[in-house]
Amino acid sequence: YNGSMAAIVYDASASKVLIASSSSGAAGAAIVGTVSGTTISFGTAITYSTSNDSYYFSAAYDANAQKTLIVYDANISGVRRGACVVATVSGTSVTVGTEVLYSNFNTSNSNAGVSYDSDAKKLTIFFKETSTPQYNALVGTISGTSVTFGTPVALTLNGDLSTETGFVAAYDPTAGKTALIYATKTATTGLYYGVWTTGYTATNL
């Protein structure tokens, strides 16, 4: 689940859930959960990020790397940037690699979405920024405790995306494509959707 203030994923290799959110000081935080019956217990939370102003978390588990990519919006030197870390779960503990900026432009008011393509063994981040093109998809590859990215691909989206924009994405292994849902704070025509492959088009839902 990709939420505006928290994200949760299932780590299949560790048989645990991983939650990413803001800490009480607004730095990035992560904690491992173990489900037993109808209850859940937690390990010790960690904090990360060079910013004490991190919000809009999304996450996706990479089954090939057996790690999770946590994506969030961070205040870097007074400018909101798209940032991410690679998280590794071991038992009831989690560690993260060095923070990586996936956008050097302002990503304010954008809840990025991230999904894992199990066929390509890659992750894709969908996000909004103040540059041109404004809406992009970015493919990433996890290696060790870090992630590297290719060249952003511009998205042509429908609807009024001038204000807050939220993205949620999920990969369909049968179709071999990623479904992208996005919405805005001011949208009056509902949600929008699109299908991501090597190209991209979007249709109003």
Write out the residue ranges for each language-model feature:
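Polar, enzyme-active/binding microenvironments
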Residues: 1-205
